[in-house]
Amino acid sequence: GGTGPVLVAGDGWSLPASPRRQHAAVVRHASRVSLPFPEPAIAVSSRAEVFLGYLDYFRSRLVSKLEALPGGELRRSRLPSGWTPIELLKHLAHDELRWLEWRFEGRPVADPWGEDRDGRWYVAPGETLEELVAALHAQAARSRAVVESHDLADMGQPGDGWDTAGPAALERVLLHLVQEYARHVGHLDIVSELADGQIGE
């Protein structure tokens, strides 16, 4: 055959593995299966779907890496800044809430900074990984609904959430969220390698 190894994505469909994907599958031996990387050559229906595809991918990588960590590592910090992996998960869900619902759509949000306490990320002792993953998935669905109901050029609603900068276009908000996820999932790659030798892409 000419297609080489095949990687199976989380919902059961498969795709031929490029050399880069084959390598990634080997080095991520400890990770749970996550969505395939949204390669630039893959056709999409719109520019908005490009952003949504990257956000879906980074969320899936985040969750698979967290689920692959030994349980004690979720609330352990391995870096001088002091954050823990489970705190990172809660932070990213709230980041989407802040940017897309509170700022862009101008919705009233009871606690837009709900992951923050005394200037640092916080997860209560009773909050579990399963609950926070479910919250992330629920937020992802709401985020997609916001994006699909607007054009990328639409401007956010005026409000206090923007500080002094003023509202931004949806496209700029999505670009910010993609870089935020990419940066933090890269941070989690480092923490995972320190915790159990799991090597990221």
Task: Describe the function of each predicted region.
Residues G119-Q157, E171-V178:
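Acidic/histidine-rich alpha-helical segments that form the ligand environment
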Residues Q22-H23, H29:
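Low-complexity, intrinsically disordered or signal/transmembrane-proximal segments
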Residues R28-A41, A48-G119, G159-E201:
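Short, contiguous alpha-helical
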Residues T3, A9, A17, A24-A25:
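Ala/Thr-enriched low-complexity intrinsically disordered regions
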